[in-house]
């Protein structure tokens, strides 16, 4: 991991097309701005981890969940 020290207003380049700007420091947090092409997905790691955990939980649903869904949804076909 590369660790850099930057002041508000200073920038970090990632490749040729991603720019991270330090906006301001707030207490024990930092506000940053990210400029990237539209095709680049930018997510906070805690959101990605929460979605992954929810997907795992959903994939492990028991038979009672299947029966509940069958009673709610119309028959296929």
From Swiss-Prot:
InterPro entries cross-referenced by the UniProt entry: CsrA (IPR003751), CsrA_sf (IPR036107)
GO cellular component: cytosol
GO molecular function, one term: mRNA 5'-UTR binding
Pfam families per UniProt: CsrA (PF02599)
Subunit field text: Homodimer; the beta-strands of each monomer intercalate to form a hydrophobic core, while the alpha-helices form wings that extend away from the core.
Function: A translational regulator that binds mRNA to regulate translation initiation and/or mRNA stability. Usually binds in the 5'-UTR at or near the Shine-Dalgarno sequence preventing ribosome-binding, thus repressing translation. Its main target seems to be the major flagellin gene, while its function is anatagonized by FliW.
Protein name: Translational regulator CsrA
Organism, as annotated: Pseudarthrobacter chlorophenolicus (strain ATCC 700700 / DSM 12829 / CIP 107037 / JCM 12360 / KCTC 9906 / NCIMB 13794 / A6)
């Amino acid at each position: 991991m590369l660790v850099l020290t930057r002041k508000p207003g200073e920038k970090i380049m990632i490749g040729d097309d991603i720019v991270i700007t330090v906006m301001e420091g707030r207490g024990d947090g930092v506000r940053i701005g990210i400029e990237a092409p539209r095709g680049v997905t930018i997510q906070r790691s805690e959101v990605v981890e929460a979605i992954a955990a929810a997907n795992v939980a959903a994939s492990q649903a028991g038979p009672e969940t299947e029966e509940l869904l069958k009673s709610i949804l119309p028959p296929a076909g």
